[in-house]
């Protein structure tokens, strides 16, 4: 494999004073033990309203890498943009409030999921238990920032995918042991088979914005590795607390690598799709079916897809009526092409809504991967025991 390129991190102002410390708590499912101390956030008022003038801390990324620069063909994706460098997005006050909401007992109790791709994820909680998080990602100013970087007008794909959390936590003792093991293996020239936070995958949705909720001052590693069109690897160094990365992750294989030197790595991922109903919606549910409340996921997926179809039909109906009033001949072939596209749209939608009794909770197959070697690697991994 070719040597990996790297993107240097962008350091945000005013975050050095907020450093979370670990504490112990009861395990939620016998595997994951939340040890994150969130006391700084808990001291805040319970009803903090998102205010973009206070809580946005945006500075444009120094560079945005195009799909072409990453080695992909012009027809891949819904935008020319591949991935941005890390950039400051939210203030320290915003991050504290987000941590307060997402690390609450109710979220851990009702919205924690795990799979063979990622050990600990929190999903679907924003409308009920995280109003600040919900409003932050629905705010027009936030959407304008993400859309400008992505090179296309975007909206959150659906409420269920607002504020998805990936978590890796360990005790101080575990942190020190991992550092010592990594140093020993490096000295002996061994290749360390690191367990990633989120294994190789493509996203189910066109774009994601990945926000760092942890202090990364002493963190080693923790990058997101992207597979380029020529199969080489580009490592995007993890953003600092309050910083984010915009990625067209539906079309690029990527992995969240393990971080050393820190007791936690918590990222928030919000997924986006094009606002325009006339643009393709390549959403799949491959990587999210097994880690979701399926009836809710299917309802929200159906709702927005049928809204897209409704808008397309209304637009086409207006077009043929206008042509009739203008005494233009009816274009049969144009309508047949439109109908075929909508048939394919509905067939794809039907395919993604797999019957609930055929979905294995916590297990995602390799159909989301693009590269044969990664598919083969995935097949060789032992299928986890579902508890």
How would you describe each model-predicted region?
Residues 160, 194-207, 232, 239-240:
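A short beta-loop-beta micro-motif enriched in histidine and acidic residues
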């Amino acid at each position: 494999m070719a040597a990996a390129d790297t993107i240097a991190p962008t350091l945000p102002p005013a975050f050095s004073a907020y450093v979370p410390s670990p504490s112990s708590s009861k395990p939620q499912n016998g595997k994951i033990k939340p040890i994150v101390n969130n006391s700084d956030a808990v001291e805040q008022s319970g009803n903090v309203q998102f205010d973009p003038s206070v809580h946005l801390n945006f500075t444009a990324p120094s560079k945005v890498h195009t799909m072409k620069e990453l080695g992909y063909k012009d027809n891949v994706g819904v935008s020319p943009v591949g991935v941005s460098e890390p950039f400051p997005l939210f203030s320290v006050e915003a991050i504290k409030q987000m941590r307060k909401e997402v690390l609450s007992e109710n979220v851990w109790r009702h919205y924690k999921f795990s799979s063979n791709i990622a050990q600990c994820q929190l999903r679907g909680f924003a409308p009920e238990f995280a109003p600040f998080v919900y409003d932050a990602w629905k705010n027009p100013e936030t959407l304008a920032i993400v859309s400008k970087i992505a090179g296309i007008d975007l909206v959150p794909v659906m409420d269920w995918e607002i504020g998805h959390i990936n978590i890796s936590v360990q005790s101080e003792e575990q942190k020190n042991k991992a550092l010592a093991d990594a140093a020993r293996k490096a000295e002996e020239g061994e290749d360390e088979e690191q367990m990633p936070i989120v294994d190789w995958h493509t996203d189910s949705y066109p774009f994601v914005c990945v926000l760092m909720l942890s202090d990364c001052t002493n963190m080693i590693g923790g990058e997101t590795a992207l597979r380029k069109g020529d199969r080489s690897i580009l490592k995007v160094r993890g953003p600092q607390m309050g910083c984010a990365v915009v990625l067209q992750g539906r079309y690029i294989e990527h992995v969240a690598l393990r971080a050393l030197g820190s007791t936690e790595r918590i990222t928030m991922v919000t997924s986006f799709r094009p606002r325009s109903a006339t643009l393709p919606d390549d959403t799949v549910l491959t990587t999210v079916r097994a880690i979701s409340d399926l009836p809710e996921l299917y309802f929200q997926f159906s709702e927005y897809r049928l809204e897209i179809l409704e808008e397309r039909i209304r637009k086409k109906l207006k077009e043929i009526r206008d042509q009739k009033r203008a005494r233009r001949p009816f274009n049969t072939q144009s309508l047949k092409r439109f109908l075929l596209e909508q048939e394919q749209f509905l067939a794809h939608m039907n395919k993604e809504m797999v019957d609930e009794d055929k979905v294995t909770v916590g297990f995602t197959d390799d159909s989301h991967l693009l590269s044969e070697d990664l598919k083969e690697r995935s097949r060789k991994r032992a299928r986890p025991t579902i508890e």
